[in-house]
């Protein structure tokens, strides 16, 4: 999965897809626990416009057009949407409300109340393992609305918190248990594109866990990767996805000797909730 990073304005969608992305990541900013804008703000990755934005409902409806056969904008390659939920300042109760409201808005504007809605898989990326109630609120809302089937298309990622330290894999696993999540688990690791690479120790530990007999992780992605050398290292370690500001760079590496025979772009037929090789 090549994940176009920080795609928050409608005009950025085709740009990222034309460069080779088959997945997109959006930043969802909340107002009174309601998803209101796709917006990141400053600071953000180097060489990027941090203040591009759109109303969330408009963006979700546009994503539906890009991922529903029959629309003029439909792009078969776009198979995964990662919603980076900016809920870091919420307590668990507020996060639950945010989960309820996110479910309602996606149901209405992206899934079109399950009537010819968007077909892409969805990952909810949550910034704090303490906010496990967000997932509960999201899942219970879709069930209450009579659309539990849509949960087959939804996965989850706890990305933090970053301070004072990132949670351990055991702590992350415990948060998923509290949220009632078994399977459909993505794990992210990485830093901004201007940060030093480091030794990828946490990434390697996560991949080892993913591949173990009792691992709880299904897929792992690394961000924000813009340099050829970093892409090569991430692929050699064994990531499932790469989040990038330059999808064409990833495409180039995938075509290199040593990689083109081992990796290919994911398609809609590849289940993002299945651990490769298991």
Swiss-Prot record:
* Details of cofactor binding: Binds 1 Mg(2+) ion per subunit.
Q: Name one GO molecular function term.
A: metal ion binding
Entry EC number(s): 4.6.1.-
One GO CC term of this entry? extracellular region
Q: Indicate the residues that form the catalytic site.
A: 5, 40
What are the record keywords, sorted? Cytolysis, Dermonecrotic toxin, Disulfide bond, Hemolysis, Lipid degradation, Lipid metabolism, Lyase, Magnesium, Metal-binding, Secreted, Toxin
Q: Where, by tissue, is this protein expressed?
A: Expressed by the venom gland.
Signal peptide (residue range): none
Disulfide-bonded cysteine pairs: these are: 44-50
| TM region positions | none
UniProt record, GO biological process = killing of cells of another organism; lipid catabolic process
SUPFAM superfamilies xrefs: PLC-like phosphodiesterases
Catalytically driven reaction(s):
an N-(acyl)-sphingosylphosphocholine = an N-(acyl)-sphingosyl-1,3-cyclic phosphate + choline; an N-(acyl)-sphingosylphosphoethanolamine = an N-(acyl)-sphingosyl-1,3-cyclic phosphate + ethanolamine; a 1-acyl-sn-glycero-3-phosphocholine = a 1-acyl-sn-glycero-2,3-cyclic phosphate + choline; a 1-acyl-sn-glycero-3-phosphoethanolamine = a 1-acyl-sn-glycero-2,3-cyclic phosphate + ethanolamine
Annotated binding of Mg(2+), by residue: 25, 27, 84
Q: What is this protein for, i.e. what is its function?
A: Dermonecrotic toxins cleave the phosphodiester linkage between the phosphate and headgroup of certain phospholipids (sphingolipid and lysolipid substrates), forming an alcohol (often choline) and a cyclic phosphate. This toxin acts on sphingomyelin (SM). It may also act on ceramide phosphoethanolamine (CPE), lysophosphatidylcholine (LPC) and lysophosphatidylethanolamine (LPE), but not on lysophosphatidylserine (LPS), and lysophosphatidylglycerol (LPG). It acts by transphosphatidylation, releasing exclusively cyclic phosphate products as second products.
- Family assignment from sequence similarity: Belongs to the arthropod phospholipase D family. Class I subfamily.
Q: What is this protein called?
A: Dermonecrotic toxin Ls4SicTox-alphaIII1ii
Originating organism: Loxosceles sp. (strain 4 GJB-2008)
């Amino acid at each position: 999965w090549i994940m176009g990073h920080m795609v928050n304005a409608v005009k950025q969608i085709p740009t990222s897809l034309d460069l080779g992305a088959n997945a997109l990541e959006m930043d969802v900013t909340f107002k009174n626990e309601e998803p209101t804008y796709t917006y990141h703000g400053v600071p953000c990755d180097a060489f990027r416009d941090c203040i591009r934005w759109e109303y969330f409902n408009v963006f979700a409806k546009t994503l539906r057009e890009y991922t529903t056969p029959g629309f003029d904008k439909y792009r078969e390659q776009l198979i995964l949407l990662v919603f980076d939920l900016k809920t870091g300042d919420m307590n668990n109760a507020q996060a639950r409300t945010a989960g309820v409201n996110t479910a309602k808005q996606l149901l209405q504007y992206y899934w079109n109340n399950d009537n010819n809605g968007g077909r892409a898989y969805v990952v909810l990326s949550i910034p704090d393992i303490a906010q496990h109630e967000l997932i509960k609120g999201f899942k219970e809302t879709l069930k209450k609305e009579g659309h539990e089937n849509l949960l087959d298309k939804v996965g989850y990622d706890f990305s933090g918190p970053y301070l004072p330290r990132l949670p351990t894999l055991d702590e992350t696993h415990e948060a998923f248990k509290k949220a009632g999540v078994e399977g459909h688990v993505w794990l992210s690791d990485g830093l901004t594109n201007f940060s030093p690479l480091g030794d990828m120790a946490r990434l390697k530990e996560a991949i080892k866990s993913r591949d173990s007999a009792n691992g709880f992780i299904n897929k792992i992605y690394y961000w924000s990767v813009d340099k050829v050398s970093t892409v090569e290292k991430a692929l050699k370690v064994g990531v499932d996805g790469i989040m990038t500001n330059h999808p064409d760079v990833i495409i180039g590496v995938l075509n290199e000797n040593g990689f083109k025979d081992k990796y290919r772009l994911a398609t809609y037929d590849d289940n993002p909730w299945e651990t490769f090789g298991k």
